[in-house]
């Protein structure tokens, strides 16, 4: 899932500016599992906005914010409220925020959270596999790092192998930051550094082509509208999603 984190109160206040009446759309999946979105996040943000003297015109928890058709349906469904609003606050990752812009709600779109990386839906926060967030580098190495993202976890940002001081250091402490363990020691235990080196050579080749995508089927507009309507009106299911974590 795409992990999100709340923006600071100062930044959110700056983004809202002079908007006195706002509508709030909240994502029921990724942001919900991050603890920022869903019905609970929507209520928490609404309380804060009211504390700031803002009037919350409408609140809508969508099953997901990133699909454009769902966002379009939500904008259409809440058209009257949006026309009475000065801004649309979106509790979603960047994909949902972009969908809101594309849906043209007629008011400024204000993201309430920041996208901070891709993580598994898991409660094992003490494990580096779930702790290391994807940086969307475009060339994933998880297959040979035991599921740990070294770009995120290594202070030196090393991707295909440890820093030159790796062999010099005794014990498991990081050469750059002795207050933490060297993540490459853990990668060495769980992964395969030799194959990681071969992957580096492969990734460095110019003209390396990705597998082609299958031909995109054009879903008929009426089918998209029905699917969008169903998902917009199924937002109440979002209250159950945090229970899987």
Protein language model annotation of sequence segments:
Residues 90-94:
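N-terminal glycine-rich "phosphate-gripper" loop used for MgATP/nucleotide binding
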Residues 96-99:
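Short, well-ordered alpha-helical microsegments
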Residues 63-71:
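Ligand-binding beta-strand-loop-alpha-helix segment within the catalytic cores
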Residues 1-63, 75-88, 102-118, 122-140, ...:
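Iron-sulfur (Fe-S) cluster-binding modules
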């Amino acid at each position: 899932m795409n992990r999100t984190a709340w923006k600071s109160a100062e930044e959110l206040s700056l983004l809202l500016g002079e908007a006195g009446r706002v509508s709030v759309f909240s994502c029921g999946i990724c942001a919900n599992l991050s603890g920022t979105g869903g019905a609970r996040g929507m209520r928490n943000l609404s309380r804060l906005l009211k504390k700031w003297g803002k009037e919350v015109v409408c609140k809508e928890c969508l099953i997901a914010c990133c699909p454009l058709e769902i966002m379009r349906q939500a904008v259409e469904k809440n058209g009257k409220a949006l026309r009475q609003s000065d801004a649309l606050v979106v509790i979603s990752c960047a994909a949902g925020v972009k969908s809101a812009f594309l849906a043209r709600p007629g008011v400024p779109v204000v993201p309430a959270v920041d996208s901070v990386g891709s993580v598994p839906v898991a409660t094992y926060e003490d494990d580096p596999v779930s702790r290391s967030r994807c940086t969307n580098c475009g060339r994933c190495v998880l297959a040979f790092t035991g599921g740990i993202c070294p770009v995120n976890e290594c202070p030196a940002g090393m991707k295909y192998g440890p820093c030159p001081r790796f062999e010099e250091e005794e014990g498991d402490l990081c050469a750059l930051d002795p207050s933490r363990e060297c993540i490459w020691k853990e990668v060495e235990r769980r992964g395969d550094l030799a194959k990681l080196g071969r992957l580096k050579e492969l990734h460095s080749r110019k003209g390396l082509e990705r597998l082609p995508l299958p031909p995109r089927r054009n879903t008929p507009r009426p089918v998209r509208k029905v699917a969008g309507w169903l998902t917009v009106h199924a937002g109440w299911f979002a209250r159950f999603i945090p229970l899987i974590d």
